[in-house]
Structure formats: C-alpha cells, structure tokens
Amino acid sequence: MEGQNKSITFDGREIRLTTGLYAPQASGSVMIECGDTSLLVTATKTTKKEASDFLPLICDYEEKLYAAGRIPGGFMRREGRPPERATLISRLIDRPMRPLFPTWMRDEIQIVASCLSLDERVPADVLAVTGASIATLLGEIPFYGPMAAVRVGLIGDDFILNPSYREIEKGDLDIVVAGSPDGIVMIEAGANQLSEQDTIEAIDFGYEAVTELIKSQEDLLKDLGIKQIKPSDPEEDKTLPSYLEKNCSKAIDLVLKKFDQSKEERDLELEKIKTETQSKIDSLKDDNEVRVLTSENEKLIHSDFKKLTKKLMRSQIINDGKRVDGRELDEVRKITASAGILPKRVHGSALFQRGLTQVLSTTTLGTPSDAQEMDDLNPSTEKTYLHHYNFPPYSVGETRPMRTPGRREIGHGALAERAIIPVLPGKETFPYVLRVVSEVLSSNGSTSMGSVCGSTLSLLDAGVPLKAPVGGTAMGLIKEGKDVRILTDIQGIEDFLGDMDFKVAGTNKGITALQMDMKITGLPVSIISDAIKKARPARLHILEKMQEAIDKPQESLSPHAPRLLSFRIDPELIGTVIGPGGRTIKGITERTNTKIDIEDGGIVTIASHDGAAAEEAQKIIEGLTRKVHEGEIFSGVVTRIIPIGAFVEILPGKEGMVHISQLSEARVERVEDVVRQGDEVTVRVREIDSRGRINLTLRGVGQNNGMSYPEPTPTPVAPLN
C-alpha cells in the first residue's frame, strides 16, 4: 500500500499529511500529524434518501485511550459513551464547516476525526478542524473552503501559536480561530479578564496564521492534481417565491412592524398568514403552477415563506434601523434578577431574566472528593468547577421526550463554565468543589449568556468569594452586500434569521469567554472588532442590573452546606495520616464524623457539618504529623497495657511506649503497679529508633497529673500560597 506524503512547515513545526492510503472507501481521507499527535480524518458523502429542509451534516470526533497508552477503566475495559471533551471537539469541527457548505445541499455528509496518538505538546482539536477541511476537499465535495483553525495563547505580553497543554494552563488566553478565504467563520475562547483590544489583536494574529494553512491546502490540491469543486447555486424556480412576495409581503411587513407585540403574538400572526396563503393555493386550479409545486413538496411553502420573512426582517433592520421588538440596534432587553429565591437547602440560587429568556441557576458546595474524575485524553485529571445546562422542551412551548443532555446542552454548559472559571477563588482560600446547574425556564435567545449571569448570582448567593461578577450578551449581525448592522442582545428570531451569533462574556475589567458562529462564509477582523467593542457597554449595563440583586458574596454559607478546613502537611507524612490499609484516617473520620481528603501535595481538606468536629480532626492530624524530638516532655494518657510496658498517647493519634524498666527508678514487677489504662502521666521522649518508634520514660520526670496535651506545632512546610 502506498499513499502520498506532504509536509507543511508551520510556525517552525512540521505538519505531515498522508493521503490515498487510509480509509479508501471514504470520499476523502487524510492522516494529519504533528509531533506525536496523529489523527485520521475522513469525509463521506452519500445521497439523501428523503427530502429535507436542512443540511444533514454529522461531525464526530472520537478518541481512544490507546492514543495515550492507557486502558479504559470500568468492567468492560472499553470506551463507552463519548466523553464531554469529545463532544466539544465534535462541535468545534461542525461549527466552522457547516456555513461553508451550500445552503441547498441535501446530501448526507459525515466527517469523522479519530485521534490515534496524542502528544501533550500538540493538542488534537485544531488539527482535527483543519483535517476536516482537507478530507472534504480530497473527497471532491462542494465546499466554500479551504478552511483551517489555529489556537492562540498569551503568556506575558507574547502571543503563542498552537501552545501546548501546559502553556495553555499558564497563559491568560486560550482562543481557537477558524477561517476561510472570505474571513473568520468561528471563534471559541476563554480568557483571564483580557481587554477588548488584546482580544482583537489575538484574533487578528490567529487569522494571519489561518491564511497560511489555507494556502498550504490549495498547494496540496495542485500537487495531487485535484480540482476543488466550488458550489454553484442551482437555478431557483421563482414561481412560488414570486407568488408569496406578491400575496404576503405587505401582511408580513405589518406584523414585523408591530413593535409592541409579544413573541407569541408575532409567531401566531405569521403562522396565520402562512396558513391562509396555503388555503388560497389549495383553492387554485389543479393545473396552476403554484399549486402543482406545493402539492409535490409540502415543505416548499414553509421554506419559501421563511425566506421571505427573513428578507423583510433584514430589510427593516438595514433600512430603518429598527428591530422586530422596536429596540434600537444597540439596546438591551429589559432585565430582572433576584438571588436567594430557593430555600437554603439549596446552597445558592438565582433567577435571571432578559426579555423572554429566563434562567434559574443553583449552586451546590461539595467536598474535594466530589470532584469529577476525567477519564479521557485531557491531561487534567479532575474538574472542581462544574456547570450543567438544561434546556427542557417547555422553555420554547414544545412537547418532546426528556432525554440525556445533547451536544447543544453540553456546549452551552461548557461555554458558561469557561466564562466563570477565571474569577473563581483559589482552592487554598475556598476549597469547595462547585456545581452550578442552569435550568432554562424560557428561551428567546442567548440562554447561554443568561446562564453566565445566573451562575454569577447563584455563586454569590452561596457565599463564593468571586474575584468579580461575570455577565454576558449575544451580538448579532445582518449583512447585505456592503451594508452591515451589528445587533446587541439578539433574540430568537434575530439569531434564526441573522448571519452571526457572537457571545461575549466578561467582567467590568475584561473578557472571560467568547463564542462566535457564522451562517455566512466569513467576516473580516474589522467587523468582528466592532462587535467586540459594542458588546462592552451592553455587558457593563447587565452587570449593573445584576449587582442590584446581589453585589457581594453572602457572609455566611447555607447551614446545610459542608464546613471545610484546609491546611498543609509535609507530603512525606501523608502515609502516616492514612495508616496501614487506611486504618488511621478511617479511625479519625469515624471518631470525629468528618470527611477527609488529602492531595498528593500535602493539602488536607476536612469536611463536616460541625465546625468543632472538623477542628478536632485537624488537631489529630497535626498531632500525627508533628515531629517529636528526643528530650521533649509531654503530658499524655495511657492507652494500653502490655506485659513489658505501657503505651501513652502523647499527641492526638500519636503514641509512644514506656518500657517496664522506664516506669520508675525502682524495680517494677508488674506494669499495673505503677500505671493503669486511662491514667494521665508526664513522659519524656527517651529516643526515636530507626523505624520511627517513640520510646518514652517516666524516670526523672516529675508527674503533674491533669496536665493537658501541649499545643501541637505542625511540621514546617511551604505555605499554601
């Protein structure tokens, strides 16, 4: 078997492409490699069997643990349902690919990116996105590409192209920019309160690199003798569109100009116009061309009516500067917010509403053992902040079965999660695991940004000391030729009929998250820059409204939330605290009715609903880890008697033995003649043997019964910060 190999030098690295060797029955396939990261990306097109009114595109990213030399956990030792990371990368591929296929295409297209080997220095996601474009081009599928994606990081004052996982963690920015020859088609970003100007410069920096990869793909096609199939729009039958424009335009335009009506009223009126039009068509003669067309395809009137509505709404915005609800282009809908709306058995809660979009967010405080373990190819092993987003059917007035979260819900949850992470307190000052759940109670656009706002409010209500509140809004776009209008705080119909959905979240200082999706084949950086700048005053307005509901963390936690104590011990003494088979730590938890977690670095977290119990457990652990020195004197309690001596607890959880010969200056026949179990005695540390056992003596030590334990002094270690 022989394939064709090509190397691309990009940012000082070699990207290796192998074509014509793998997956020969796919329409197009490429093995794309950089460092030790290898992905097989395939694109397959089949003829659609049933008529539909959308592009049936499926993008799947799959990762197998063998790519990192690991065997899956669980009884079956086999990968099961795709992890959240795989779902998010699948969306990352889909979002820039979808607008680059012609709107009229109805053939089934599936893109599969399989991670076969993973190098932690080379994240696989952006390679998968670029590989999807290459596989589609090689498969000679109509496509407005090439398309490529890069990641941009920021360390200090320097932008870094395609940083490693470690560099991403250290930096203040993680942004993925995808683009086509026409401009940028997708942005996904998380940032540490980055200024608008720095964010714009990062996007510009990323798109410059994207153009290099686009040129490399064009060169690859030339080298292989493959001619790209540029989509050519089929001739459209104007019969039905002309009929609808003549008979419906005036009525639709009147509905769109009723600025004081509700969404439900507008939808009902538009549906009424469509139904009446359908009845008129049905009454036409059997040989009428319009009736023949609609009888052959029942969905045709629906799609053409939607196109006409879209055209009229866009014209109203472009020409009149008015939106369907009467707002100015830069106007935010009415906002209401409240915190603490649920009983305190829920640790934190809030309700955020913007227009008809309403989100209920709740916060739960958990212990370190509640962290989510990550069984995927992500180098991070656990998550301590979780955001779950739910979108029930009643939120849009529909009925359908309630299923597990879909890709959209996972993606929106991840976006809101990313927006909040930069302002969370460090685990040293607030060691709780946090779970926020956002329930979308009503949806009319920008529910993910509503979830960001609701998350902030519920976290503050739970007493979480955020560095700053985070708010967000969705920006939209209407572009007709050179006429461009940017919309602030888009609602559902503007998202559905517009060209862009650009979500911007952040604090009053800067941006924490971005997500931009397009319905056109690309936008220049200048227009994206305008959208980012116009999002700032809207965000500040939203933050001001949020702070009217709650402007600082609650001073006390819910009485039903666990109490945590966190401190550090010498990592070398972790084994002492755990004990053989976990007996020691189990004994402490049972004695104090607490929950104890110890990290590899020596950070101990004690959870309890009783603060005194947590303090008792801390005292025991500090006693266990306190180093005892020869010559020290302790007041302790006799815990056990054996024929050759007595065991004395000198510190909580730490015992030493007094040999029978060390009980008195005089000869002792029986241990019980001098001490009994439960006696308080004063002892001196005689020696600590090579095995760490503490030998004590009563000889030469004046007894002072009733003396309490000395305050334990923890072993000196590095401070938490």
From Swiss-Prot:
GO cellular component: cytosol
EC nos: 2.7.7.8
Keywords from the UniProt entry: Cytoplasm, Magnesium, Metal-binding, Nucleotidyltransferase, RNA-binding, Transferase
Class of this enzyme: transferase
Cofactor(s) listed in the protein's UniProt record: Mg(2+)
Listed Pro residues bias regions: 711-721
Protein name: Polyribonucleotide nucleotidyltransferase
